C-alpha cells in the first residue's frame, strides 16, 4: 500500500508540474478526468481486445498508461481539495485503508476481483467519463498489471521528472514519446 509520505511526494510533484504548465491550473477547468479516460482507452488498446486481429498484451505499455492515469487522477483529487496536498493525501490514504472491493455504477454492482483486467479498465473508463475516480479500483488494476505500489511510486516519480524536462525544453514527441 502507498504510504502517506509517498502520496504527499506524488501530490506535491503533480501540483508543481501543473503550476509549471499554468500557474492558474487549479481554476483553469482542465479535463483531467477526460485525460484519464483517454489514457484508460489507450490501456485497453495495449491490453488487446480485438477478436478479429492477433494481439498480445503489452504489459510495459499498460503499466505506463496506468502511471499516466495516476497523474491525471492526482490532479483531479487536488482540485477537489483546493490544491491542499495534505488533505488530498489524507483522503487517498483513507480510501486505500478502506479497500473497497466493489462499486455501483449505472445501477450495476461491479466486484473488482471478479473482473479481469480488461473489464476493470472498461469500468475505470466509464467512471472517468462520468468524472469519477475510484482509488480501490485503480489499485486493483495496478495489481492486475503486475505492479506493486512501490513500482507505481517509482515510475510516477520518473515520469514526473521526464515531464519537467519536457516542459523545460519545449514539449516534443521526439523527446521520448507521449505524455
Q: Which ranges hold each PLM region?
A:
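Flexible "arm" and connector segments at domain edges
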Residues: 1-179
